C-alpha cells in the first residue's frame, strides 16, 4: 500500500513539475514576444534627436573628477559632445548643441567651483540655441557632464523650456566617477509625462574607447539593428 501511495505521490510531483515548466516556458515566450514587440515599436518611432551640453577643458583630465575634453582628428571636443556624435552616427539622429549665453572658465577646478556656485544659487543660465521642430522627434537623447554631483544648470534650463510629454527621453552622462548621481530621477520629476530611460554612463577616461559599449547599449534597447 505504501508503494502505491509513493507511486501516486511521485506521479503527482512529476505532473506538477511538468505543469510548472510548461507555464514557465509559456511565460518566457510571452515576455520574449512582448519584448520583441516593444523593440519593433521603438524602432518604428520617428526621428532621433541627440541634444548635448559640453564644455571642453584645455588643462587635461583631473584624476578625481575627470575634466571633459578629447582631441580627435586634430579637433578639440568636449567629452559629452564626442559621445553625442557616436550616438548620432549609430542611430542616424540629428545633433543639437545646447549652448548658453554665459561662458564658463576653462581650467577644470575653476569650472567646477563656478558650477557649484551656480547650482547653490539655483540659477538658470539663458540658452542661445533652441529646438524649433521638437514635434518631429519621438526619441530625444540628452547628454551632459556631471558637474558637482548633478547635471549642469543649463540642463535644468533646457528641461524648463520644453515639454517632452509623450516622448522618450534618454539622458546620458560623462563623469569622473559619480555617474548620473540623482540627475535621471530629477529629469523624470521634471518631465512626468515623458518616458525617461537611463542611457549610457561613460567615465571620462573611457570616452575615446566607448564606441563598442555605446553601440551594444543601443542594440539592447532596440534603437539600432544588431
Name every feature range the model reports, one short phrase each:
Residues 25-137, 219-226:
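N-terminal beta1-alpha1-beta2 submodule of the flavodoxin-like/Rossmannoid cofactor-binding fold
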Residues 195-226:
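Glycine-rich phosphate/pyrophosphate-binding loop and the adjoining helix
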Residues 6-14:
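Sec-dependent N-terminal signal peptides
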Residues 14-22:
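Hydrophobic alpha-helical membrane-insertion segments, chiefly the h-region
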Residues 1-4:
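Positively charged n-region of N-terminal signal peptides that target proteins for export
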Residues 69-77, 142-145, 170-176, 201-204:
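Second-shell loop/turn segments in exported
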Residues 77, 81, 85, 152, ...:
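Short, surface-exposed alpha-helical segments at coil->helix boundaries
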Residues 107-192:
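Helix-loop-strand module that forms the ligand-binding subsite of alpha/beta enzymes
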Amino acid at each position: 500500500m505504501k508503494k502505491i501511495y509513493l507511486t501516486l505521490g511521485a506521479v503527482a510531483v512529476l505532473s506538477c513539475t511538468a505543469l510548472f515548466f510548461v507555464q514557465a516556458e509559456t511565460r518566457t515566450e510571452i515576455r520574449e514576444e512582448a519584448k520583441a514587440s516593444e523593440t519593433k515599436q521603438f524602432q518604428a518611432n520617428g526621428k532621433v534627436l541627440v541634444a548635448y551640453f559640453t564644455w571642453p577643458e584645455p588643462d587635461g583630465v583631473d584624476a578625481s573628477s575627470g575634466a571633459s575634453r578629447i582631441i580627435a582628428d586634430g579637433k578639440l571636443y568636449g567629452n559629452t559632445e564626442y559621445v553625442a556624435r557616436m550616438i548620432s552616427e549609430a542611430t542616424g539622429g540629428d545633433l543639437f548643441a545646447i549652448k548658453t549665453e554665459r561662458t564658463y572658465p576653462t581650467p577644470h577646478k575653476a569650472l567646477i567651483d563656478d558650477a557649484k556656485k551656480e547650482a547653490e544659487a539655483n540659477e538658470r543660465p539663458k540658452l542661445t540655441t533652441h529646438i524649433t521642430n521638437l514635434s518631429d522627434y519621438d526619441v530625444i537623447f540628452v547628454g551632459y557632464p556631471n558637474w558637482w554631483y548633478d547635471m549642469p544648470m543649463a540642463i535644468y534650463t533646457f528641461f524648463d523650456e520644453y515639454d517632452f510629454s509623450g516622448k522618450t527621453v534618454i539622458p546620458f552622462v560623462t563623469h569622473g566617477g559619480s555617474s548620473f548621481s540623482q540627475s535621471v530621477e530629477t529629469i523624470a520629476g521634471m518631465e512626468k509625462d515623458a518616458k525617461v530611460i537611463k542611457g549610457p554612463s561613460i567615465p571620462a577616461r573611457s570616452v575615446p574607447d566607448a564606441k563598442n559599449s555605446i553601440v551594444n547599449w543601443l542594440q539592447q534597447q532596440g534603437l539600432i539593428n544588431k
